[in-house]
Amino acid sequence: MTRLVTDPFRAQRGMALVEAAIALPLVLLVLIPVGEITRLFVQYSTLAHHTRSAVRYVAERAISDTTGKPVITSALTTAAQNIVVYGAPMGGGEPVIDGLTIAEVSPPVITAGGNVQLSVTHPYRSLLQLGGRLPGLGFAADLTLEDLPMTVAYTMRPL
């Protein structure tokens, strides 16, 4: 005997896969830029944290004699640059941010007001292989992330 009643779920088979195939590119279009911008903020925060730590390190040790005038020695300069790049005054190991080098860290200087200043400029390198661009898709201009310079500068009074 032939079956006259059909299974109502039989017609729905495969629909979830088709819907997922349609929705996945749209979801990725939203999530990938969010992830990339989050990565940018994390790297900037890490760079700012280590720069601030280096300035504090120099500010605590810059007063070397009884005159009260700050003096930055070459050992202090090297230690400050190592703190920014490696996270420790002695240096060594992996950089805290991929691609960060000592050359990108300016030596700490004494400003006209007697404060210690340190600045770092490091280009952000995108993980996206889209030429470093996040497409605006007609809603906004394309956002260029390739070699976006992250510049951090801190000034502290010697303690």
Residue positions per predicted region:
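Glutamine-centric residue-chemistry signal
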Residues: 12-15, 43
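Alpha-helical hydrophobic helix detector
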Residues: 16, 20-36
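N-terminal leader/signal peptides at the extreme start of proteins
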Residues: 1-13
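Short, conserved structural patches
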Residues: 2-3, 49-159
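Membrane-proximal amphipathic alpha-helices
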Residues: 36-48
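Residues within well-formed alpha-helices
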Residues: 13, 20, 37, 50-53
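Conserved acidic
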Residues: 26, 43, 72, 76
